[in-house]
Each structure stands twice: as C-alpha cells, then as structure tokens.
A protein has these predicted regions:
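Short cytosolic juxtamembrane segments of multi-pass membrane proteins
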Residues: 157-164
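Hydrophobic transmembrane alpha-helices
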Residues: 23, 53-61, 83-101, 108-117, ...
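Membrane-interfacial helix-loop-helix junctions in multi-pass membrane proteins
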Residues: 44, 96-150
Length: 164
C-alpha cells in the first residue's frame, strides 16, 4: 500500500486497480460454476449466457465495492473481515436463496431488497430457468447498479491517503 500512496493517483484509480483482478477471478468462478452445473446436474440454460455474464459482472462489482468500502473504513484487517461476515449471512438468508422470499415476514423482505444478492438470484433464475431477456431482468439490475454506485462512492469518499 505504501507504493500506491507514493504514486500520483486518485482514489478512484486505486480502487479500479485493486478491483479489476478480482472481477476477473469472479468471472472465472462463474464460468466454472456454470460448466460444472451443466455437466454434473444438467442445469438448463434457456436464456442468453452473454446477458448472464454481463448481469453477474455488475453483481461481482457490487460485492467488490462493498469489500473496498469495508477496507477503507475499518481500522484493521480483522475489523474489515468482521464487517464482511456481518453482511454475508443476512444477504444470503434474506435473499431467497435458502427460504422462499415471499414466505418471509415483510420486514425481512424489505431488508432483503437492499442486498444485491436478492436481485442477482432473481436474474440468474430468470435467465437460466425462464429464458428472460434484458427487458425482464432490467428491474433487477438497477438496484444492483444503485447499490454499487452508492457503496463505491462511500469507498472513494472514505479512502485515506495515509497509513495512519
């Protein structure tokens, strides 16, 4: 980090440089998961794989922006990991992944709508199982994009140019 701080770069440039490799890793995970799911479980793919990859890229970016935000506001690596764990479990439990979304209490549904995981699951299910196109998934993409922009802006704003 000391080398980055010594360079004449803006916080947004540091953020992009740190996030881009992880986006590539996220795409590798998506491709491997899709390949294994198709081969081992005969997962149907009724929609556009290209559309799925683009939509999941936004989801990957939203999670990386959240992680970057945690790392900028945390005072230690341990604190950043605890923040990540604190949001991981609710995002999975309230997304509709483990329990039917509309079977949850209203407060849980409202809370679940905040997390990008909820919308990403709807996109994945829509594209893979229903063959949804761009028009059908757009209502699920804008909340992910808004989350990414807000959380990314917080990360840039909170970025410290010193090591404290």
């Amino acid at each position: 980090m000391e080398n980055l701080l010594a360079m004449p770069v803006r916080p947004i440039e540091v953020m992009i440089a740190k996030i881009v490799p992880y986006i590539a890793i996220g795409y590798v995970q998506v491709v491997l998961t899709m390949a294994i799911s198709s081969a081992a479980f005969d997962l149907p793919v009724r929609g556009s794989l290209f559309l799925l990859i683009v939509a999941l890229g936004l989801f990957i970016a939203s999670n990386l922006a959240l992680g970057f935000t945690f790392s900028t506001i945390a005072s230690s690596q341990m604190q950043a990991m605890q923040m990540a764990q604190f949001t991981l479990l609710p995002s999975i439990l309230l997304s509709g992944f483990m329990f039917p979304f509309y079977g949850m209490p209203k407060w849980a549904q409202w809370t679940g709508e905040i997390f990008p995981t909820t919308h990403a699951l709807r996109v994945v299910r829509g594209i893979l199982l229903k063959g949804n196109g761009a028009a059908e998934i757009l209502p699920e993409l804008w909340p992910i994009a808004a989350f990414t922009l807000v959380v990314g802006a917080i990360a840039i704003w909170a970025y410290r140019e010193t090591l404290d």
